[in-house]
């Protein structure tokens, strides 16, 4: 967690410093903007049935920006997010999976997630945005054959909360956010509570 938190804090510091530059007319955004993004999803599931470790996957999505004032805006989003239940805290295993043909197959989950974010502009420009809001996810596909169960292991619906920061350039954007699950996603008969957490790092274009 400390490894993931440090880059986010450094990014926030750099973005805030960037936002303190002299105001430029090009910083003024139009009321309506459309965006597309993709990036890395680092997630874990908390519960006695899971190790307190992370795994990596990906997320793809699109959003609409409604810039109501110079400081406040709304950003509805729809994202396709993939997660897996094989987890590791050894970064060398992640490198092996990325570059040397390793795999994660124990429990793959595909979600379609809908978020409603409040954008709060930081500093004199509209470049740096603090993002906060709720999210609802629908489980589209579940592959958990290693658990030897014929029933649904994970619940179909999940509610979560998001918080993060985004740097909005004229055409491109990048950012990071933290997601915490608010509901129990355990769909089995045992009483163990499962809640998800994730760090997301993304880049994209804004039209």
Predicted regions and their residues:
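Cleavable N-terminal export/targeting peptides
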Residues: 1-29
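Short glycine/proline- and aromatic-enriched beta-strand/turn motifs that initiate or cap beta-hairpins
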Residues: 20-61, 181
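Hydrophobic, lipid-facing positions within transmembrane beta-strands of outer-membrane proteins
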Residues: 34, 56-62, 112-116, 128, ...
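Gram-negative (and chloroplast) outer-membrane scaffold detector with strong preference
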Residues: 22-24, 28, 32, 40-42, ...
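Outer-membrane beta-barrel translocator domains and adjoining extracellular loop/strand segments
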Residues: 46-51, 86-93, 142-149, 186-191
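Predominantly the C-terminal beta-signal and adjacent terminal strand-loop region
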Residues: 77, 81-88, 156, 160-207
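A charged, solvent-exposed segment within the mature domains of Sec-exported extracytoplasmic proteins
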Residues: 127-129, 138-175
């Amino acid at each position: 967690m400390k490894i993931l938190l440090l880059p986010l804090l450094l990014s926030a510091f750099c973005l805030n410093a960037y936002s303190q530059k002299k105001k430029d007319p090009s910083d003024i955004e139009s009321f309506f903007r459309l965006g597309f993004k993709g990036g890395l999803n680092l997630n874990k599931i908390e519960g006695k049935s899971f190790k307190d470790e992370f795994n990596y996957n990906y997320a793809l999505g699109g959003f609409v920006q409604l810039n109501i004032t110079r400081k406040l805006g709304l950003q509805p989003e729809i994202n396709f997010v993939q997660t897996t239940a094989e987890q590791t805290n050894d970064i060398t295993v992640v490198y092996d999976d990325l570059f040397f043909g390793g795999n994660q197959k124990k429990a793959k989950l595909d979600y379609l997630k809908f978020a409603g974010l409040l954008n709060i502009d930081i500093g004199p420009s509209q470049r740096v945005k603090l993002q906060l809001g709720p999210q609802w996810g629908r489980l589209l596909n579940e592959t958990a054959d290693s658990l030897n169960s014929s029933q649904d292991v994970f619940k179909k619906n999940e509610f979560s909360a998001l918080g993060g920061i985004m740097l909005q350039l004229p055409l491109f954007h990048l950012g990071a956010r933290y997601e915490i699950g608010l509901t129990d996603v355990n769909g089995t008969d045992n009483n163990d509570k499962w809640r998800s957490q994730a760090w997301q790092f993304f880049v994209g274009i804004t039209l």
